[in-house]
Amino acid sequence: MIRKQNFNIPGAKGRGMLMDLTYDDTNKFAPLIIFAHGFKGFKDWGTHNLLAQYFAEHGFRFLKFNFSHNGTTTDKPLDFTNLIAFADNTFTIELEDLNAVINFAWNGSSMPAASTIYLIGHSMGGGISIIKTAEDVRIKKLVTMASISGFSNLWPKKAEEQWRLQGMMYVHNARTKQEMPLKVTLLHDLDKNQARLNIAAQAALVTQPWLIVHGDADTSVPLTHAEELKAAQPHAELLVIPGGDHTFGASHPWLNSTLPAPLMQFCEKVLQFLSNN
């Protein structure tokens, strides 16, 4: 039977991170997939629970989590109610969060220890996952979906000067209609950690098997990002999904009980990739 177990662990700056593990109770020691959501995302967005169900039904455990500063709270995990935390977020914070999640899974204090860990990262979570994979031998395989090839691609370059002057920039959330604040500390993080946070440079250091998946209809993060990642790491495998947008046909809320066709194509390819030795 497919079951779900919930956890709450401390992330960066001690801020709580909600997580859930979806698994088949007849296969409690199955290989573990850790899923990292993207910018303005959260673990229960749209089709993420169906994604977890799919992989649990096909021989994997699936652990997804909310980054500590993604703007949600442990009380309201579906809404961006903590914009103060969102404003304080940095890429280094997200790397610290992901490390905490991997440590939690690896140590096995609250769940059967994971000796085989795979990462799936979406959009900005893809960039974070690339860096983490380059740094951490515990990660055996990497899958990126609609990943960015550079963090500075998340905002207009022309906005940086004003951002540095004012100390704050606001990004519009088309779904919630919120204006979400970002402190200039995000830019300072890039300034101080240029080598570590250079996604393309880190991509070149990834030695683990890596599947890059991108839709050719992605208007948020164009296909050129995937091509740049492939150029940085020629050993990676690139899959282009025809008609796939940034979320592979998914939206929030997702009221259907089945995955959209582009996302199902993604799942089938990832299943094949992770199942091959």
Predicted segment positions?
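Acidic catalytic loop of the alpha/beta-hydrolase fold
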Residues: 217-221, 246
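N-terminal cap/lid segment of alpha/beta-hydrolase-fold proteins
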Residues: 1-27
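Primarily recognizes the serine-hydrolase "nucleophile elbow" in alpha/beta-hydrolase
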Residues: 101-163
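Short beta-strand/loop motif that positions the catalytic acidic residue
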Residues: 205-207, 212-214, 218
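Catalytic active-site module of serine/aspartate enzymes centered on a nucleophile-bearing elbow/loop
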Residues: 244-277
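Short alpha-helix in the alpha/beta-hydrolase fold that links the catalytic acid
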Residues: 48, 208, 222-231, 253
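Alpha/beta-hydrolase active-site loop
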Residues: 84-109
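Short, surface-exposed "cap/lid" segments of acyl-processing enzymes
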Residues: 26-71
